[in-house]
Each structure stands twice: as C-alpha cells, then as structure tokens.
Amino acid sequence: MPSPQILTVDLGERSYDIQVGHGLLDENPAFQALARGRSVAVISDSNVDPIYGAKVEALLAPVAHQVVRIVVPAGEASKCWQQLDAIHDRMLEARLDRKSLIVALGGGVVGDLAGFAAASFQRGIDFGQVPTSLLAQVDSSVGGKTGINHARGKNMVGAFHQPRLVVADTGTLKTLPSRELAAGLAEVIKHGAIADRTYLEQVAVDMPALLACQPEALARAILASMRIKAAVVAADEREAGVRAHLNFGHTFGHAIEVGAGYGKWLHGEAVAAGMVMAADLSVRLGRMPAEQLDELRRIITSANLPTRAPAWPVDDYLRHMAIDKKADHGIPVFVVLNGLGHAATTRADEALVRAVIADHLR
C-alpha cells in the first residue's frame, strides 16, 4: 500500500485521522481494522457505486462480518427523508445493529446523507468517510456535519456526528466529471480566501494543473485545504464561533441552490457566485479593497466557475436567506473578508444587501 499522508482532527477522545494519497482503496490496514468483525453498510450513489462499490466491498469483506451495499440516486435530491428512510429500512432488513459501521462512499451528498443515517440509526453508530469528489475531499468529509435538505432550506435537518476515519484516495478524482471538479475548486478557493492568502495565490498559479487533474497539484491543494478545515473544526466543532467562517459565500449560495431547485446548480457553483457577492459586500462595508474583490473574481473565473447569480427578484433571495442556519431571529448573518485571507461575521443593512444582490445577477 502506498504510504498516505496523515492529518489528525484533534477532538480529544473523538479525534480521527484523515488519509490522503493514491491507491488507498487497493490496500488499507487502518480501514480494514475499523471494519473488522462488524456488519458494514457501504452507502453510495448510482454514479459512484458502479465504479468503486465492488472495490470497497472486496477490501472490507475479508475482515467484516458482512458488507451490505446501499445505492441511492445520484444528485442533491437524494438528501431527503425518503432516501434516509430507505437506507434505514435496508439496514434493518440486513440486521445491522449498534455495533455496525456505515461507510460513506461518494461525494458531498452521499457523505451528508450517510453521515446522518449513522447519526440517527439506533441513536448513533460509527461511520467512515471515503470521499470520491474534490469537494468532499477538501471540505465536506471533514468536520462531522451531516444532514438532509428541507423544501424551505438546505441542510436544515441534521446532526454533528464525527467520522472515525476519512480515506481520501486521490485516484478517484480521475473519474470525476469536469463540472464536478470545478465545483470542488470553489471550496479550495474559499479556504484560501478566508484563512491563507498565500495559499490562495498558489491555487491561482496551480489552476491549469488543477483543472487538468495533475496529481501533485491536487494533492497539494487537498492537503492544504484539509489542514485549514481540520484546524478550524478542532477549534470550534459546533460552529459557535470561527467555524462559521467556513460558510463564506454560503449565505448567498444556499439561496441560489434553494431557489433554483436542488441539483440545478452544484453546491460549489452556487458558493462561487456567493463568494463574489460576499466579497463585494465586504468592499461596500469598507473591510476590503476593491482590487482584492477583482483578484478573487479572476481566480474564480479561471476555475470555470460562475461569478453571477440567477436573475430572480431580490426579494426571493432575501426570503431564502432569512432561514439560513446562520440567521439570527430571521436576520441574515454574513461571512465577510477583512481582506483576502481574513474572515469575520457581521450583519448588514438590508438596503446594502439588496444592492449587492442586484448588481450580481445575470
């Protein structure tokens, strides 16, 4: 087995390792140790299971009591009560119990859904993350946020439930569609924008190599982003403070996702447009020079990501943002930049927010 690079999310007795490397699904003693003697439910989607489902089953079956593969339809629409219920039905049919293990094999949708299935099954069982998309590898697989969507808002139903292990096999990215790759780059850009301008500048330099799936560039970005995410989660697991900074671009972005209908805009695409809007708000609040907004917009554009939002009535955006998870008594709270590499949270005057939205519609 190739030696993975190991990062640790330091949460005391609930700490866990993140493995990053190539070929980690071919041979993996740590992953097998987690599954040893247990009933394992490998939850994946209709795109990923045909490619990697049998591989993960073959890796775990020799040590597990049983391996059950559960497949949900690909796409954001699967983050719903019906799919969660179907997963629990299949687990109960297979007689999984409180000692069983769930493995989330796929992108961010599968990770969120399978993680919530683990958090809610028999009051909580162990799970491991095997992210196969760039977005999941650099962001959503780390930190323990799990959940499903509601018609009124994204990720409105869920729980914090930390994985026991994250296995990020960079080899899985070679099968990732170019649109999904670009969506993952939105989260890479976000990490640099909120926490490390030098990293953001390196991402800009590496962008052609990242879009070409060049292994060294991808590994560099994944490790750097995971270090930022792991440090933030260790400092603020439950999002009482600094972890909210990871939602830069998400207040505007979630409004785009909900308004368009889940899955019409990929999460990373919506966050990309949302970051431009949040950065413009930062400029108008006097927190960041306009030149840095232009720099961020150029980097986002270079990743083949949108920088403008759908041309809906501004009132529609405000209605969706009022039930954002960061909202305080229905008043939106925004993550803004005190210059590239430095994030903060703030409220903003509604008239100013309206102007920002209106100026960034297609």
What are these regions (language model features)?
Residues 2-7, 186-189, 287-362:
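C-terminal charged capping/lid subdomain of soluble metabolic enzymes
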Residues 21, 42, 80, 131, ...:
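Residue-level signal for inorganic ion chemistry
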Residues 113-124, 259-260, 280:
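Alpha-helix C-terminal capping segments
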Residues 10, 34-35, 94-97, 120-122, ...:
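Solvent-exposed alpha-helices and their adjacent loops that cap or buttress functional pockets
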Residues 109-116, 137-138, 254-255:
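Short glycine/serine/threonine-rich phosphate/pyrophosphate-binding segments
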Residues 202, 206-315:
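Active-site segments that bind and position negatively charged phosphate/pyrophosphate groups
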Residues 1-101:
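ATP/NTP phosphate-donor binding region
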Residues 19, 116-209:
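A glycine/threonine-rich phosphate-anchoring loop and its flanking beta-alpha core
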